[in-house]
Amino acid sequence: MSSALSPEGDRRYSDDSLSSVSTTSLVFERIQEKTEMDADNDKEKDPRALDDEDPLRDEDDLETGPFLGPGASLHREPMDRGLRRILIIVAVVFIGGWLAGLGIFIASGSYHHESDTEHDPDANSRGSGKSLSMDQLFDGTWSPKYHSISWIAGPKGEDGLLLEVGASNKPYIVVEDIRSDKNVATRDDAEPKASNSRTLMEHPYFEYDGKQYSPSWSEPSPDLTKVLLGVDRKKNWRHSFSAIYFVLDVKTQEAEPLVPDQVDARIQLASWSPKSDAVSFTRENNLYIRRLTGDKDVTQITKDGGPEYFYGIPDWVYEEEVFSGRSATWWSDDGKYLAFLRTNETGVPEYPVQFFIERPSGTTPEDGEEAYPEVEQIKYPKAGAHNPVVDLQFYDIGKKDTFSVEIDGAFADDDRIINNLLWAGDKAIVKQTNRVSDVLKVVLVDVPSRKGKTINTININEIDGGWFEISHKMTYIPADPKNGREHDGYVDSVIHEGYDHLAYFTPLDNSEPIMLTKGNWEVDDAPSAVDLANNLVYFIAAKESSIQRHVYSVKLDGSDLQALTDPKTEAYYDASFSKGAGFVFLSYRGPKVPTQKVISTPVSASSYERIIEDNAELADRARRHELPILKYGTLDLDTGVKVNYVERRPPHFDAKKQYPVLFHQYSGPGSQSVTKRFAVDFQAYVAAALGYLVITVDPRGTGFLGRKHRVTVRSKLGVHEAHDHIAAAASFASRPYVDAERLAIWGWSYGGFTTLKTLEQDAGRTFSYGMAVAPVTDWRFYDSIYTERYMRTPQDNPDGYDLSKVANATALGENKRFLLMHGVADDNVHFQNSLTLLDDLDLAGVENYDVHVFPDSDHSIYFHNGNRIVYDKLRNWLINAFNGEWLKVSNPQPQKDPVEKEKRHMVPQALV
């Protein structure tokens, strides 16, 4: 779930405002609303039935009469002539004024759906534009254009090289040197080492043995003389896939199979040697090396790979929760050694994932078995079950020898999670934790001597009682005595005084680092890059605000912290640095419309700036549409906790009215939903098009407010999160513009779990409705590595698991109604979670809910139009909830048909 679908309801706010829409248009809107409502009422069996939720209904409305029953009529007295004359005069004056106002309105041009000003999320909405639609959310209308840049290191150490694949009007794969770009201006008369672009692959296809292939994956060799090409790509799990691989010679533009004479060999992973002379690859879970020099032979490194043994690639749980990727292979920088993970799944139980509509395996069922679903058995360790046993192995390329290194005091096989490996010259730094992620060991392996030792052990229980997060940003700093670096070292994130910060460890076995950052703020998955020539470390941090991100640099001695982006301007940045850190690809993601550009770093010899994407069309679209008014703030909850929130208000927000409220959240440990990122998503649609308030709160357990805010949820997931959402809802319910009787909450994945825990804990006292998609309902059902990091094992913490389980069906029955949706083929949060909850509800006799399941859909629910159905269902269900429709079905009664009643009266009494 670390990578699980997590909605990002990040919005900006502005001050309160009254809509600038004219009185005339408001009159038209209310007339239209009333006309539509009357038309709807005409469809009812009883045309005089009153709708208590009708905002236009007035108790003094003579057309309906507040106390008139069916068949009743009004007796009207004749109107006095003097009064009639006065009313006629008033009507004439009103119509004249209305026509004059209409003329002024048309002349002003205010009716046009556009604005000359840039979309500013901090400004008050005019409410004069076009409306958002659900179709726009699904056709990409509101998706910012984001480009990805692949920086590559030059064969001779050149900086500023970009890899472009599939760019229009260019060869298919090209290496561009931005130092030769016309936008480069040299500083201090320094000459940029300009060079021409280099074509690696001319066309988006190649031929082999008379057959044409189109690659779906590519990776150039480090010396740029060859390109690995993957074709016929087939998805495996979230990150992994298999493909048929070829090696393209750049000079001749000719390709050959990676596995000689086996053109159809399906490969799970292929990686270049740093020297470009070999490729390691995993096939059928065994590891191989294909040499590209000399006899070009293939060496099989392992031989016992198969359904239960993996080499060089992760199994399901390691791919999902540890590496967030498909590789468990690491080449040493000199190409002499290959480190790889060996995973033994022998003891891991299997979970069956059923497919009722299609057969993902592509196999044809046996005769007579066509009507049976296909069942995929996945090795899935649930909390407390047997984990895969992993150990690290090394392969000596020259000696063709595989070996492992024993470490004194290492974790036992069933209590070890290997999180990361970093090559530091001919040494390897390995980070591993115990099973429940509260003890960290850093191991240093001298690979040539085949010896290793533990250089640092940290017990988090002695610090704050929390857990260690997994990070893959550890960066090697080689020694350079002439540049002030006497020894090899590395930069890594550490816990410092309750916050995540950067530290520089040197020499490699030093456990007392130089702190590079300090303070009551946190770095974000840092470092981003290191400039070795200038002893600078670049990183992204939430320094100015926990909901913003800016780019900074700091020297390796911890001095001279500088901002690369303007910290005085509210912003949320991502950054990707060139290999030498002389250039950076800056992605501004909000709060205004996102943009992207490449610039030179301040210490670069060249001054460079190039706009990659300005999203001009999106900016223009934002000017022409009614987007929500965004208001950010912090809430002081009744527990003394401060939480961030964002409130999305309708464009025509009127503080004198009362609005129903939808709370949207994710709430997972270390996550963050309240940020300054730009997004026009389902939450924006609900606020702007449906006219509801949509609020997101980041409760305890979420990220970037310090360790204390995060780790309080350990061993009892869902308890504090639910309490904070209830307290936040109660706080908003006390505001005059909030309809306290119409509060709902929804979420997906962990957000679905938190939705149910909130409804359970609240039992209808604050929230009336909830919508949960693909929720965990019992943490015993989720995977071991994620769950035990926050909950420990069920064997050690049975009470905590009971407390976190969505178990009080009776309390759920106290809510007005809730909605549950789940994909049947969810290999992440198993359908088992929803099924067991449904059984608990049945046993308790609880029926105030609706269910929709999606055959063959996984956790993201996309199969056969599933995703659109999810959001249509959320929309329609929510409208029915806030319109009071679900109150009508809570205790349904048969309608008495007057016609049938008359017929019954005509039947002889004896026959009745």
Swiss-Prot record:
Residues modified by glycosylation: N344, N808
Positions annotated as active site in the UniProt record: S749, D826, H859
Topology in membrane: Single-pass type II membrane protein
Sequence ranges of Acidic residues compositional bias: 51-63
Domain of life: Eukaryota
Regions of compositional bias (Low complexity) in chain numbering: 16-27
Keyword annotations of the record: Aminopeptidase, Glycoprotein, Hydrolase, Membrane, Protease, Serine protease, Signal-anchor, Transmembrane, Transmembrane helix, Vacuole
Entry's EC annotation: 3.4.14.5
GO BP terms in the entry: proteolysis
PANTHER family registered for this protein in UniProt: DIPEPTIDYL PEPTIDASE 10, ISOFORM B, PROTEASE FAMILY S9B,C DIPEPTIDYL-PEPTIDASE IV-RELATED
Function: Type IV dipeptidyl-peptidase which removes N-terminal dipeptides sequentially from polypeptides having unsubstituted N-termini provided that the penultimate residue is proline.
Protein name per Swiss-Prot or TrEMBL: Probable dipeptidyl-aminopeptidase B
Species for this entry: Fusarium vanettenii (strain ATCC MYA-4622 / CBS 123669 / FGSC 9596 / NRRL 45880 / 77-13-4) (Fusarium solani subsp. pisi)
